[in-house]
């Protein structure tokens, strides 16, 4: 069943809607202002957002090795420039991470949409050296681990 979660702000509280149980997590990008009713999808959302946090951490550290933990080997990155859609292998992102080096990175999770073993996440991100972006990720669950299959972005 397809579930849509709207998540607004930066840092910590996830609520399980069934049974009134609250669960704390330390996912970057979520806040106690988030109104998330996850029920049995709590573990999925946490695992999905782990991949997004690895992406952000790769930016913070300028590390392609950390980035590789977030993406599948066949992942792609896309954007529109001058009206033309460009898609490149994710290795282009890794090269950019290494060239840019360490920087401050923050993000806000806006949407998490799960359908079985695939998911979509939309974030607003800010990189101190590169600027602000609208990032959208398509993820798939592989061997119990969520990996980013595609990143598409626009510059804010």
Name every feature range the model reports, one short phrase each.
Residues 23-61, 69, 73:
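Short, low-complexity N-terminal intrinsically disordered segments enriched in polar/charged residues
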Residues 55, 67, 75, 121, ...:
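Hydrophobic pocket/interface hotspot
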Residues 70-76, 83-84:
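Acidic helix-start/capping segments at beta-turn-to-alpha-helix junctions
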Residues 71, 81, 113, 124-127, ...:
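A mature extracytoplasmic/lumenal domain signature
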Residues 73, 117, 144-145:
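Beta-strand-connecting loop/turn residues
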Residues 132-156:
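Short beta-strand edge/turn micro-motifs at domain boundaries
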């Amino acid at each position: 069943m397809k579930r849509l979660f709207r998540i607004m702000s930066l840092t910590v509280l996830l609520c399980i809607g069934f049974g009134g149980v609250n669960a704390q997590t330390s996912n970057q990008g979520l806040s106690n202002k988030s109104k998330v009713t996850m029920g049995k999808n709590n573990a999925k959302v946490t695992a999905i957002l782990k991949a997004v946090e690895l992406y952000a951490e790769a930016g913070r550290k300028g590390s392609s090795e950390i980035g590789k933990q977030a993406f599948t080997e066949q992942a792609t990155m896309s954007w529109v420039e001058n009206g033309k859609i460009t898609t490149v292998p994710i290795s282009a992102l890794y090269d950019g991470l290494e060239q840019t080096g360490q920087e401050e990175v923050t993000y806000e999770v806006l949407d998490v949409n799960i359908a079985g073993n695939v998911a979509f996440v939309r974030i607003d991100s800010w990189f101190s050296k590169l600027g602000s972006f609208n990032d959208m990720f398509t993820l798939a669950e592989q061997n119990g681990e969520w990996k980013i299959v595609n990143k598409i972005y626009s510059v804010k």
